[in-house]
Amino acid sequence: EISLGLVGSEMCIRDRCYTAINLPYGSLSSMMIRESSERDKLSVLRMGLSPIGKIVAATCTLPLVKLLGNDQAAWIKVMSVWAVLALALLLLCFFRCEEKVQIEARKKDEKLPIPTMLKALFANQYFWAVMLLWTVQSVSFTITGTILPYYCKYIFNNDTWMYSALFLTETLVLVVGIFICSPLIKKFGKRNIAFVGGFVALGGQILFFLNPYSFGFMVMSCVTRAIGLAPLNAVVFSMVGDVVEFGQWKNHIRQESLIFAGGSIGTKVGAGLASAVITGLLSSSGYVSSSAGITAQPETALEMIVSLYKFGPILIAAVIIVTLFGYKLDKMYPAIMQELTEREAHGQL
């Protein structure tokens, strides 16, 4: 028998290890290169391959478990395979990536106290803007990923293939859209394509309003929303790197780790709050868990499921549009880098 305490300990250790790996990995792009256009390529590659990895893991896990005996030992073996593969990829990253950003003025700089570092971080207005964008990107996946299964089961009365088909369709369109964004970033800029993408995502969700009980309209909405959100997914990590340079320019303090860590915390908190709000709203509407043996839901719960799926993505698109409306860092970046180059040549951050 496995105790609840043992399971909790395992989860804590796993999450600590994940955080210890993910934060340095996330900030690595700002330490590898300072050219914004090159960071754009890294961001596109990272965000384009990430959903593919999720699809591979999701589609291959159960077949592998069945192939290896379909018992507890089979699950352990399959998880071990994924762990070894992940370790191999991390080692590849470790040996092949090089931190080429070396700033002599930074080596001479004394370590600053934590309050000073936090004050500089909180005074960086673009940190808040990009953290909000990173958070809503994460929340958008939480909303659709949480509500869509309920929608397919209770509104479309299908808990077999519809959710998988919609999820796969939206994910594949998102991946293709992310890679298509690479030349668009170079021509139009990160902010501009993400800003237009927000309107496309908004339009796709409004399209769904025309007939929220039609599977065809659901497919069109998923495809349009994925096209609209692809630009933000493509550029968000490159934007975080730009924020690092802006922070150094504004405060004479370079904060790669703190900026990426702060953004990461925002996404985790945002996704957690979104899940809690969704759960709370469903409970308040009278939703009854299927584990209780009840397959029918009260009308209020069905209306809540429809409302959450209708208005959640609308809110996400609105936040993206409003945030990017005042985002001017793309225009400022060349002048910022020129001034930083001159300051660093004189031994200043």
Q: What is the predicted function of each stretch?
A:
Residues 1-13:
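Single conserved hydrophobic/aromatic residue that forms the stacking wall/gate
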Residues 9, 21, 25-149, 153-154, ...:
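Intracellular loop-helix junctions on the cytosolic face of multi-pass helical membrane proteins
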Residues 9-10, 209-222:
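Helix-loop junctions at membrane interfaces in 12-TM secondary transporters
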Residues 43-62, 262-282:
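Glycine-rich segments within core transmembrane alpha-helices of 12-TM secondary carriers
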Residues 55, 171-179, 272:
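Residue-level signature of mid-helix packing/kink "hotspots" within the transmembrane helices
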Residues 82, 165-174:
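Transmembrane alpha-helical segments of major facilitator superfamily
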Residues 176-190:
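Helix-to-loop junctions at the C-terminal end of transmembrane segments
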Residues 192-207:
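Structural signature of the two symmetry-related core transmembrane helices
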